Amino acid sequence: MVRSTLRIIFFILISLASAEAATFKELVKSQAKITPNISIFIKNLSTNEVIVSYRANKRMIPASNQKIITTLTSLDLLGEDFKFSTYIFLLDKINEKGIYSGNIYIDSRGDPSLSSSKLKDAVNFFKEKDLKVIQGNIIIDNTYFESPEYNKNWKNSWKGSYWAPYISSIAVDNNLYKSGGTFLLTDNPLYLLGVKFRKILRSNGIIFKGNIVLKEIPLRDKLVPFKIIYEINSPSLSNLVYIVNKESDNLY
């Protein structure tokens, strides 16, 4: 329904260039036969001239049209080439036996497109550093995005729905995990990141017996100059915005 409405609006706006004011209302009415849920108000902000007004006071649910505002703002503020980064790092050296005695840290900063394949690349990076054993925990920073994790105005019955995802500074594999042959949506994206990263560590022969811990990574640890660090970058913002709007992806 949303995509159909957007196509109709696009057709109407394109037609504005050639339609006279007197015939425009007839044009809108013809489209209203396809869907009655049309409300249009177009105003020239420079002259305050109302260009089009059709059922302007009809209350409408903006729905996915809001994505246009948020994505346009992000492009304006960050630029189309901006990329979200995720940092995975160790704070100390790996000894000659391949043993690392500390924690491994994941600092996630808003990438909605992270995948298990990129986590595998990170694990391969640490394997090349001769990492064989991690004696500490997986620490995942859970403070980059503010609370709440779930919109307080959303119904509890919506939880677990793909169109009402939890708000998190990371999404790995679209926040999906497999259980009994079925893909399910997690209600704890950061913890799922830890679970998937732990699985990849072990499947690549790296011994890990610690826990997955969600907490703030102190700034002093993020700034340690000699840490071993791997950086994962998202596709460019312009590519992410395409997914948001073209596919109407609520997760992104």
PLM regions with names:
Residues 1-4, 23:
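Short, low-complexity, intrinsically disordered N-terminal peptides in bacterial proteins
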Residues 37-39, 65, 85, 103:
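A common structural microfeature
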Residues 44, 67, 141:
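Acidic active-site catalytic centers that drive phospho-/nucleotidyl reactions
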